[in-house]
Every structure is written in structure tokens, then in C-alpha cells.
Amino acid sequence: MNAVLSVQGASAPVKKKSFFSKFTRLNMLRLARAVIPAAVLMMFFPQLAMAAGSSGQDLMASGNTTVKATFGKDSSVVKWVVLAEVLVGAVMYMMTKNVKFLAGFAIISVFIAVGMAVVGL
């Protein structure tokens, strides 16, 4: 038994929708219609929006000393992370000869320092 396969019509590539096609004027108006009432309610009732009460209890307060000891400025974890960044940056530079990888550890170290300061460690 012989089966013959045939294609009906001309095969044309299917045009994919662009990522930016989602950002149409109509979609932006729909988004604004959904967001503006919520923003107005949060503006008039900030206590409900933030769910902050004066009688709240910090359940994670007992772990602050442990976190500061593990991830603080003088901890060994931060030193090992920086050392790993330097080694990975050096190896990636040797493999690709791209200076971005070599200087990347300095940029990541700055981000870590700023992040630690923001968090309070």
C-alpha cells in the first residue's frame, strides 16, 4: 500500500506577533482603567494598602543577629562570594578576551556593598 502525502496550498511562513504589539493604545487604556481605581483607593486608605498596624509584631526580629553574623560585613560568606566573582571573572576573561568579564567583579562588588547597606547588614 503506497501512501502519497501532499501539501495543500502554498507554504508561507507564519508571521509571529511582535512583543511590542502588546503595547497598543487600547491595551494601555485597559491597564490604566484597572490601575487608577486601585491607586486612588490606596491613596485614600494608606493603612489598608500597606497593611501596617501599630500593634504589629516583627516575627523575624529574633533572626537578625544570625543573619548579620552570617552575611554581615566581616563574615566569611561575603569574602568567599567576592573571591568567587574574581575567579569566575578571570576565567571568563581568559576564555573570551572580553574586558567586560574582567571588570564585572568590581561592578558586582559595588552592587553587593550597596545592597548590604540598604538591607542594613
From Swiss-Prot:
The modification N-acetylalanine is found at A52. Its main location: membrane. Keywords: Acetylation, Cell inner membrane, Cell membrane, Conjugation, Membrane, Plasmid, Secreted, Transmembrane, Transmembrane helix. Changing D58A: No production of propilin or pilin. It is found in: Cell inner membrane; Secreted. Pfam families: TraA (PF05513). Changing D74G: No effect on propilin synthesis, no effect on pilus formation, resistant to phage R17 attachment. About 67% conjugation efficiency, E.coli still sensitive to CdiA-CT toxin. Disruption phenotype: Loss of sensitivity to toxin CdiA-CT. One of its GO terms (cellular component) is extracellular region. Changing K100A: Reduced cleavage of propilin to pilin. Changing G120C: Resistant to phage R17, conjugation normal, provides partial resistance to CdiA-CT toxin. Residues 1-75 are periplasmic. Changing K68E: Resistant to phage R17 attachment. Residues 1-51 form a propeptide. It is a multi-pass membrane protein. Changing N98A: No effect on propilin synthesis. No effect on pilus formation. The chain crosses the membrane at residues 76-96, 101-121. Residues 97-100 are cytoplasmic. The keyword Transmembrane helix applies. Changing V81I: Slightly reduced phage R17 attachment, reduced ability to retract. Changing K79I: No effect on propilin synthesis. Defective pilus tip assembly. The keyword Transmembrane applies. Propilin is the precursor of the pilus subunit, pilin, that forms conjugative pili, the filamentous surface appendages required for cell-to-cell contact during the earlier stages of bacterial conjugation, and that retract after contact is established. Mature pilin is assembled with the help of TraQ and TraX. Functions as a receptor for CdiA-CT from E.cloacae and E.coli, although it is not clear if this is physiologically relevant. Monomer. Interacts with itself to form filaments; also interacts with TraQ. Belongs to the TraA family. This is Pilin. The lineage of its organism: Bacteria, Pseudomonadati, Pseudomonadota, Gammaproteobacteria, Enterobacterales.
